[in-house]
Amino acid sequence: MHRGTQEGAMASRLLHRLRHALAGDGPGEAAASPEAEQFPESSELEDDDAEGLSSRLSGTLSFTSAEDDEDDEDEDDEEAGPDQLPLGDGTSGEDAERSPPPDGQWGSQLLARQLQDFWKKSRNTLAPQRLLFEVTSANVVKDPPSKYVLYTLAVIGPGPPDCQPAQISRRYSDFERLHRNLQRQFRGPMAAISFPRKRLRRNFTAETIARRSRAFEQFLGHLQAVPELRHAPDLQDFFVLPELRRAQSLTCTGLYREALALWANAWQLQAQLGTPSGPDRPLLTLAGLAVCHQELEDPGEARACCEKALQLLGDKSLHPLLAPFLEAHVRLSWRLGLDKRQSEARLQALQEAGLTPTPPPSLKELLIKEVLD
C-alpha cells in the first residue's frame, strides 16, 4: 500500500512538472541557472551540425512548439535526464486489460495514461512562450559589384500554433551592425553572447551558410532572452524599420497590394516584439494598412484599422495622427452605413479648438511625408 502511495505521488509530481515545463514558467525553469537558461549553446557550430542544418534551409518552415521540439538541438540531449519517462511501454490498451500487470507497474501505467491525455490536450492549446527564430531560406544575391547572402528568418511568437509567422530578410552586414551597436551600448550583457566571425574566403559555401544560419538563430534567441537587450531600440529597429521603409516606399509609388503585405508583416512583428518605445510606429503601420485597404476597395478592413488606431490614441488630442484617423473613420463609416457620430463630434471639437485644420490632412498625405528613422 505504501508503495502504491509513493508511485501515485511520483506520478502527480511528474505530471505537475511536465505541465509547468510545457507552459514555460514552472519550477523546472526556476531551478536552472539563469546563464544556462539564456545561453543553452554556443553560436559557433561544430562541423557535424552543418549537414543537419542544411536540410532545414529548404525554404519550408518547420513549426515547433514549446511541448514538441525535435530540431536536434544539443540542449535537448543535455536536458534529458532520469526524470524522463516513456509515454508507453509498447503494450496496447487491449493487451493491458487482458493481462493485468503486477502491482508495481500500476503506478507507471497510470502515469503514462495521464501524460498521454495531457499531451493530446496540450498540443492544441499551448504555444511557445518566447519568440523563436528559424532561417527558412538563404539565397546568394548577385548585385554587381556586390555579392551577398540574404537570410530569411521566420519569427514565431506566442499565439495559435497555426498562426502564420512574421518574416524578415537580412544579410550578414545587418546582423554585424546590430551586434556592434549593442556591444557598444551593453558591454556586460553582450559579453556572453557569441557572434559568427567574418571570413575572408568561403563565404558562399553551403557549409558556411548553414553554420551562419544556425548562429543567427541562436544570436537573436539569446538577445530576446535578456530583458535589457530585448527592449533595446537598436533591436527593435533591426526587426521593424526596414519593413516600414519598404512598405512606405511601395505605398508612395502606388503599389498598394505589395505594400499591404509589408505593412501587415510589420504589424505582426511589432505585436510579437512589443513596442516599449511608444505607439508611433504601430500607429504609422495602421495608417499604412488603412490607406492600402482603402485603395484596394476594402473599406471594412480600412475602418477596422482606424478603430484600432483610435483605441491606441485614447485621449491624446495633440497627436498629429488623431484628426486624420478620425476623418478617415467618419468617411468610411458613412460609406458603409455605420454609426459615425462619436468620431464626427470628436473631430469637430478638435477643429473648434484650433488643434487641426479644416479639413485635416489625409492619412495618405501624412504617410508620404513621414520620415522613418
UniProtKB/Swiss-Prot annotation:
Residues 1-107 are annotated as: Disordered. Residues 129-246 form the PX domain. SMART domains: PX. GO terms for cellular component: early endosome membrane. GO terms for molecular function: phosphatidylinositol phosphate binding; phosphatidylinositol-3-phosphate binding; phosphatidylinositol-4,5-bisphosphate binding. It is found in: Cytoplasmic vesicle membrane; Early endosome membrane. Residues 66-81 have a biased composition (Acidic residues). PROSITE patterns: PX. Keywords: Cytoplasmic vesicle, Endosome, Lipid-binding, Membrane, Protein transport, Transport. GO terms for biological process: protein transport. Residues 55-65 have a biased composition (Polar residues). It comes from the Eukaryota. A 1,2-diacyl-sn-glycero-3-phospho-(1D-myo-inositol-3-phosphate) binds at R171, S173, K198, R212. It holds the Pfam family PX. Belongs to the sorting nexin family. Monomer. Binds to membranes enriched in phosphatidylinositol 3-phosphate (PtdIns(P3)) and phosphatidylinositol 4,5-bisphosphate. May be involved in several stages of intracellular trafficking. This is Sorting nexin-21. It comes from Homo sapiens (Human). The lineage of its organism: Eukaryota, Metazoa, Chordata, Craniata, Vertebrata. The gene is SNX21.
